[in-house]
Amino acid sequence: MTMRIDTDKQMNLLSDKNVAIIGAGPVGLTMARLLQQNGVDITVYERDKDQDARIFGGTLDLHRNSGQEAMKRAGLLQTYYDLALPMGVNIVDEKGNILTTKNVRPENRFDNPEINRNDLRTILLNSLQNDTVIWDRKLVTLEPDKEKWILTFEDKSSETADLVIIANG
């Protein structure tokens, strides 16, 4: 079952709101991009010291009907395709004998191509407005305050937001 959301109506609800996103991983950055495209005031808070702090990590595959759909809506699908690598699959038994193979063919090359985690982060960061991401800000408490939220960070600083989206992990 697919649920359709009237995005124009939803974005109008956020037009005068300050939205905080906790986490500058793929989900947090994609959400920031989608909301910024619709004129929402976004700040992303990330515990990493800077965008190069996590140079390790493997690859991610974005499936056609989920991650690729989000990249499409964010206007970043072609950039993703430019850096992603189509992947074939071999299924083997316990002795290493190939039981079945799925080779990459032109018609399935974009089914779920792999992209380096850091390349994906760079694509998403470059799509955001300057100063959207505040680095080295680890959230330690989140408290309601009337119609707003108070975010307190490990460095004892605090910020206020109308809406908080937790996207860590």
Cite the ranges covered by each PLM segment:
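Conserved N-terminal helical subregion
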Residues: R4-V19, A24, L34-Q36, D61-G169
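N-terminal Rossmann-fold NAD(P) dinucleotide-binding loop
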Residues: G28-L29
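Glycine-rich FAD pyrophosphate-binding loop
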Residues: Q36-F56
